[in-house]
């Protein structure tokens, strides 16, 4: 049982569930069966995604992480794959109890998690886009349960852009290791300069879009107090990385701080 818990990565699953709860709060969800089930669905689907990732990464983990459940022999590759598919099936099945939108998101995310681990990890930009969608979709999933989804939909969009910036910066930080594994990330395929400029374009888009939830009337002024500094922090990190003043590792850590500020901005809008 412990080996399967390691395969599922419970901390990651808890973070996915928390993202759904935040989406529900922002979207004004009522405390009912759907609101209770939605975080559980997210955690179960996330567990499936983590397990299928370990299944496809078994050879790499045998060298870099021999203590992981599959290379250590505690879980067979076939059992890991069946566990992942079982998690996807259970998650999608539970989503049918909530509503059609939640069912669609759970089914789509299950397919994307499989495809990402099987074929799309390490592909230029596509992998980054997919991960960023999956991160933001936790808020979208929560929004699908709520009575006023507009604020959480904005959170999904802004979280998608912010995470996209961070994912590209992380690829820049991991160039040496990714190249050794044969991955074709954006900086490996097109150069570090191109990757930095692409990250900055997404950071600019984030800064431009940040005031729109307030201007759209879906959040109040407390949102702006934290959201504008959050966007500025993310843009500054990208610009300083392009200028060479910061390395990619420092920049992506600062972007993470900006993302936390942005999340707090939406929670502040509830006040």
UniProtKB/Swiss-Prot annotation:
Disulfide bonds: none annotated. The keyword Protease does not apply. It is a multi-pass membrane protein. Its main location: membrane. Pfam families: UbiA. One of its GO terms (biological process) is glycerophospholipid biosynthetic process. Keywords: Cell membrane, Lipid biosynthesis, Lipid metabolism, Magnesium, Membrane, Phospholipid biosynthesis, Phospholipid metabolism, Transferase, Transmembrane, Transmembrane helix. One of its GO terms (molecular function) is geranylgeranylglycerol-phosphate geranylgeranyltransferase activity. It comes from the Archaea. The keyword Transmembrane applies. It is an enzyme of class 2 (transferase). Its EC number is 2.5.1.42. The chain crosses the membrane at residues 11-31, 33-53, 88-108, 125-145, 149-169, 201-221, 224-244, 251-271. Its cofactor is Mg(2+). Pathway: Membrane lipid metabolism; glycerophospholipid metabolism. One of its GO terms (cellular component) is plasma membrane. Coiled coil: none annotated. It is found in: Cell membrane. It catalyses: sn-3-O-(geranylgeranyl)glycerol 1-phosphate + (2E,6E,10E)-geranylgeranyl diphosphate = 2,3-bis-O-(geranylgeranyl)-sn-glycerol 1-phosphate + diphosphate. InterPro entries: DGGGP_synth, Prenyltransferase_related, UbiA_prenyltransferase, UbiA_sf. Belongs to the UbiA prenyltransferase family. DGGGP synthase subfamily. HAMAP family: DGGGP_synth. Prenyltransferase that catalyzes the transfer of the geranylgeranyl moiety of geranylgeranyl diphosphate (GGPP) to the C2 hydroxyl of (S)-3-O-geranylgeranylglyceryl phosphate (GGGP). This reaction is the second ether-bond-formation step in the biosynthesis of archaeal membrane lipids. This is Digeranylgeranylglyceryl phosphate synthase. The lineage of its organism: Archaea, Methanobacteriati, Methanobacteriota, Methanomada group, Methanopyri.
């Amino acid at each position: 049982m412990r080996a399967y818990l390691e395969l599922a990565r419970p901390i990651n699953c808890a973070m996915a569930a928390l993202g759904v709860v935040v989406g529900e709060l922002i979207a004004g969800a009522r405390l009912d069966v759907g609101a209770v089930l939605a975080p559980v669905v997210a955690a179960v689907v996330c567990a499936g995604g983590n397990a299928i990732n370990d299944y496809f990464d078994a050879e790499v983990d045998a060298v870099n992480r021999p203590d992981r459940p599959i290379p250590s022999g505690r879980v067979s590759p076939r059992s890991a794959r069946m566990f992942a598919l079982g998690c996807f099936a259970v998650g999608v099945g539970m989503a049918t109890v909530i509503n059609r939108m939640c069912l669609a998101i759970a089914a789509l995310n299950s397919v994307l998690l499989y495809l990402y681990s099987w074929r799309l990890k390490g592909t230029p930009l596509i992998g980054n886009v997919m991960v960023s969608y999956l991160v933001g979709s936790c808020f979208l999933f929560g929004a699908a349960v709520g009575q006023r989804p507009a604020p959480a939909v904005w959170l999904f969009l802004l979280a998608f852009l912010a995470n996209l910036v961070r994912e590209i910066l992380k690829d820049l930080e991991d160039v040496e290791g990714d190249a050794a594994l044969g991955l074709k990330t954006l900086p490996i395929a097109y150069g570090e300069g191109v990757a930095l400029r692409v990250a900055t374009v997404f950071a600019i888009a984030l800064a431009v879009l940040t005031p729109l939830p307030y201007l759209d009337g879906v959040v109040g002024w407390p949102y702006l107090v934290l959201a504008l500094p959050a966007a500025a922090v993310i843009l500054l990190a990208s610009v300083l990385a392009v200028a060479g003043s910061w390395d990619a590792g420092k920049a992506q850590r600062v972007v993470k701080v900006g993302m936390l500020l942005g999340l707090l901005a939406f929670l502040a809008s509830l006040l």
